[in-house]
């Protein structure tokens, strides 16, 4: 995020903790890279996809925007985005394969999953670019990330409830995503506290509401995953 504030010299207070912020950025990248790698592995093993289609399109569109159109000047951020974008293309291919099986009850979707993913990604991509043109890439980066996170957390929770099955998900998938996102909250908090002239808006009511919503949704996901997993274990023991 500080990679989009090159016109502003960081204050001395922030420079002292920048190493910590960059460490959390790397932690964010590590968590999401593990999550993406596991999603690819699950997809290629024929398991259902664990990310709903719209959040998937939105994620890859956001990464396209801030890797290619508005690249960050922060090398750590840019490297994380580039790796995530590369892995997301493989995830997209895996999602297309999974959709043929998971959505076989809906031929319109299962037979045209690739086209739907492409159109969805282009729509989200143009939306992220338009937002950056409207309010500037620094703000759009953050608000776009908020939308991505909420769509993913809430979409994932309802996907788990709708399936009532652990197929396509695991504790490692959930925890890597959750910890990666918590690292995002941590480095954003450091920037807000030690560079308030640029990032003070991160303490706004809407951002705080988004933070609470994310924490509630992802915590609920963990609780529901435990309940579903426990029910599956009991069912297997009966048989």
UniProtKB/Swiss-Prot annotation:
User: Does the keyword Heme feature in the UniProt annotation?
Assistant: no
Q: Which gene encodes it?
A: idtB
> What outcome is recorded for mutants in which this gene has been deleted?
Simultaneous disruption of idtB, idtC, idtF and idtG eliminates the biosynthesis of the whole spectrum of indole-diterpenes reported to be produced by C.paspali, including paspaline, paxilline, paspalinine, paspalitrem A and paspalitrem B.
Q: Extract the InterPro entries matched here.
A: PaxB-like (IPR039020)
Class of this enzyme: lyase
Q: Which residues are glycosylated?
A: 164
The organism's lineage is: Eukaryota, Fungi, Dikarya, Ascomycota, Pezizomycotina
Q: Which GO terms describe its molecular function?
A: lyase activity
EC number(s) given by UniProt: 4.2.3.-
Which family is this sequence assigned to?
Belongs to the paxB family.
Name of the protein this chain belongs to: Terpene cyclase idtB
Q: Which cysteines are joined by disulfide bonds?
A: none
Q: Which GO terms describe its cellular component?
A: membrane
Q: What is any Pfam family matched here? A: Pyr4-TMTC
Q: Which residues form a coiled coil?
A: none
* Topological category with respect to the lipid bilayer: Multi-pass membrane protein
Q: According to its UniProt entry, what is the function of this protein? A: Terpene cyclase; part of the gene cluster that mediates the biosynthesis of paspalitrems, indole-diterpene (IDT) mycotoxins that are potent tremorgens in mammals. The geranylgeranyl diphosphate (GGPP) synthase idtG is proposed to catalyze the first step in IDT biosynthesis via catalysis of a series of iterative condensations of isopentenyl diphosphate (IPP) with dimethylallyl diphosphate (DMAPP), geranyl diphosphate (GPP), and farnesyl diphosphate (FPP), to form GGPP. Condensation of indole-3-glycerol phosphate with GGPP by the prenyltransferase idtC then forms 3-geranylgeranylindole (3-GGI).
| Organism domain of life | Eukaryota
- Entry's localization field: Membrane
Biological pathway = Secondary metabolite biosynthesis
């Amino acid at each position: 995020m500080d990679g989009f504030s090159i016109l502003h010299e960081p204050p001395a207070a922030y420079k002292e903790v920048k190493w910590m912020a960059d460490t959390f950025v790397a932690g964010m990248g590590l968590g999401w890279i593990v999550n993406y790698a596991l999603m690819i592995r699950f997809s290629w093993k024929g398991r259902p996809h664990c990310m709903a289609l719209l959040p998937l399109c939105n994620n890859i569109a956001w990464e396209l925007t801030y890797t290619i159109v508005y690249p960050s000047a922060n090398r750590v951020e840019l490297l994380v985005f580039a790796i995530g974008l590369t892995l997301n293309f493989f995830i997209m291919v895996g999602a297309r394969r999974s959709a043929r099986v998971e959505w076989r009850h809906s031929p319109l979707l299962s037979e045209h999953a690739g086209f739907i993913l492409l159109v969805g990604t282009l729509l989200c991509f143009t939306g992220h670019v338009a937002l950056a043109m409207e309010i500037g890439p620094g703000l759009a980066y953050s608000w776009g990330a908020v939308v991505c996170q909420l769509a993913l957390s809430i979409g994932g929770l309802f996907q788990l409830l709708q399936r009532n099955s652990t197929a396509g998900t695991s504790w490692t998938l959930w925890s890597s995503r959750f910890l990666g996102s918590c690292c995002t909250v941590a480095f954003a908090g450091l920037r807000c506290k030690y560079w308030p002239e640029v990032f003070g808006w991160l303490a706004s009511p809407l951002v705080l509401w988004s933070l609470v919503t994310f924490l509630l949704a992802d915590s609920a996901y963990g609780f529901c995953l435990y309940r579903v997993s426990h029910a599956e274990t009991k069912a297997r023991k009966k048989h």
